[in-house]
Amino acid sequence: MANGAEDVVFCRGTGQSDDSDIWDDTALIKAYDKAVASFKNALKGEDGATPQENDNPGKKRKNNKKNKSRKRCNAAPDKEWQVGDSCYAFWSEDGNLYTATITSVDQEKGTCVVFYTDYGNEEEQNLSDLLTEPPDMDEDALKTANVKETESSTEESDRSFTPQKSGHAKHKSKSNFPMGPPSWFPSFPPGPPPPPPHFKKMDGRRGEGPGPSFPGWPPMIPLGPPMIPPPPPMSPDFGEDDEALGSMLISWYMSGYHTGYYMGLRQGRKEAAASKKSHRK
Amino acid sequence: MKSDAEELMPRLLPVDSCDTEEYTLTEPPRNPQEYLRFVQREASLCPDVVVAQIDPKKLKKQSVNVSITGCLAAPEGFSPSFKWQQQQVSRFSEVRQSVNKHRQHWKAQFLDDNVVMPKTEDEDGWKRFCFGENVCLEIQLKEEDGVNPGLDYVKTGFPPFLSIVSKLSQSTVSAVLEYLINWFEERDFVPQLGRWLYALLACLEKPLLPEAHSLIRQLARRCSAVRANLESKDDDRLSALNLMICIVARYFEQNDLADKE
């Protein structure tokens, strides 16, 4: 129709408008005649149906789904650490991950001293063991890291001290091993060494401290530099659990006791009222 | 029906169904249970549908008896296939789109001097315009036809040219459609009628007015009646009649009038 219209416009310019009008004017009539004739064709032959069937089947769409798996890479271990950087480090005592800040770096040895932000104590760590972000590791991997961390910390303690001081360290570690000797050692060198008798007194106080006053939390040393003791051991936790269970059972028992007491009072009043009535009658 | 009704509606008053017919209908019920069983029996005897027999003699006012029926079923072999109907509907839709597309162009065209369109209210004028004087006056002058070899639209009727049809307004289309259908009700189907009906349906705009719906339904019923009276498949009118029924039923959504294969 569009082509026909264009032709008509072109022909009109030449002056054959009558013929073009008549030719295109009959579009409706031709459509009608075509429609009427198609029914006769449909009645005559069944061959017309076959090509339609061929045209019917359409092309099947192929769904090509691309699965892109993104691999997450952990922080590069070759990162250069500087004093004042924030990081995550495994504490040698329990192998847990804590936030820390670097206070000094030794590039030659590949070690540094980290200050645990949440707990306030310091420890010497290998630069390769520090982490920029806490990784999402499996339990097995975590255990493996713990084991490695323990070994590395032992080596560090052996290397970092002079023979005389190392001797003292060995002696102290033997006596105060459960109290966390690695956390105490880094703080000793910066301060001046005290005289022997005073040192012995401090040692005695430490021995006395944990027993009577705080079963799971040793007291802070006023004379020496401030330090936070390690987290409590397992036995106090177990005791606390028992205490919780005991208090729960006691509360159950007491609620039963109070209920029984109330019921008894009520019954007693009823009996008294009944006896009075019977006595009057 | 009763079983369905019992299942659908909740039972407000459970009464055991009376299997035995020990109770006689003549005696009055002696207890409430008997009464309820009487009610059940009478209800089961009533038919679901009751039609009243009206005596025409007793009617005071004269009422119009309108018997509206659907399209007559096509004789065997006369009805078109569903695929053919779908093709016709799609082509008809394309024709309508083309007409709307080129309406402005054809409106601007001037008609020849011999083309004088009647007024909308002039029913006889439109009949003469569409069918020609020969068909209207039922004059058969073979001699004159031989004498005049050229086209004389005044006598043979004007075909539905686009330049003519494009100038019709919707009210005129509806009016002319009514005139042609009324003419068709009393007379036979002629080729000019088929062309004009096709053209008018192509120009009829959707959505239709209720009057237009009534007109096209009337047309479809008339076409089916004429088709039922045809003698053979080879009749030239069969295609046109099927086409009209198909357009009305399939395109204008009068599906109750459609042909069933």
UniProtKB/Swiss-Prot annotation, chain A:
Supply the source organism for this entry: Danio rerio
**Positions of the region Disordered?**
1-20, 42-77, 145-242
Chain spans, region Required for interaction with SYNCRIP = 264-279
Domains (record comment): The Tudor domain mediates association with dimethylarginines, which are common in snRNP proteins.
Tell me the residues on which Phosphothreonine occurs.
Answer: 14
List UniProt keywords, sorted A-Z. Answer: Cell projection, Cytoplasm, mRNA processing, mRNA splicing, Neurogenesis, Nucleus, Phosphoprotein, RNA-binding, Spliceosome
Where does the record place the region P2 (binding site for SNRPB)? 225-252
Q: Which residues form the Tudor domain?
A: 80-140
Compositional bias ranges of the Basic and acidic residues kind: 145-159
- In Gene Ontology terms, what is one molecular function of this protein? RNA binding
Keyword Transmembrane applies: no
**Compositional bias (Pro residues):** 179-197, 212-235
What is the protein's quaternary organization?
Homodimer. Component of an import snRNP complex composed of kpnb1, rnut1, smn1 and znf259. Part of the core SMN complex that contains smn1, gemin2/sip1, ddx20/gemin3, gemin4, gemin5, gemin6, gemin7, gemin8 and strap/unrip. Interacts with ddx20, fbl, nola1, rnut1, syncrip and with several spliceosomal snRNP core Sm proteins, including snrpb, snrpd1, snrpd2, snrpd3, snrpe and ilf3. Interacts with elavl4.
InterPro entries given in the database record: Smn1, SMN_C, SMN_G2-BD, SMN_Tudor, Tudor, Tudor_SMN_eumet
Please summarize what the entry says happens upon disruption of the gene: Decreased axonal branches and decreased dendrites in motor neurons. Decreased GAP43 mRNA levels. Morpholino knockdown of the protein causes severe defects in motor neuron axonal outgrowth, including truncations and abnormal branching.
SUPFAM superfamilies with a match to the protein in the record: Tudor/PWWP/MBT (SSF63748)
Phosphoserine modifications at = 17, 20
Q: What does this protein do?
A: The SMN complex plays an essential role in spliceosomal snRNP assembly in the cytoplasm and is required for pre-mRNA splicing in the nucleus. It may also play a role in the metabolism of snoRNPs. Required in motor neurons and proprioceptive neurons to ensure correct U12 intron splicing and proper levels of tmem41b mRNA. Required for the maturation of motor neuron axonal branches and dendrites.
Q: What Pfam families does the record point to? A: SMN_G2-BD (PF20636), SMN_Tudor (PF06003), SMN_YG-box (PF20635)
Record's family? Belongs to the SMN family.
Q: Where in the cell is it found?
A: Nucleus, Gem; Nucleus, Cajal body; Cytoplasm; Cytoplasmic granule
One Gene Ontology term from the biological process aspect of the record = axon extension
Q: What is this protein called?
A: Survival motor neuron protein 1
Give me the stretches of Basic residues compositional bias: 59-73
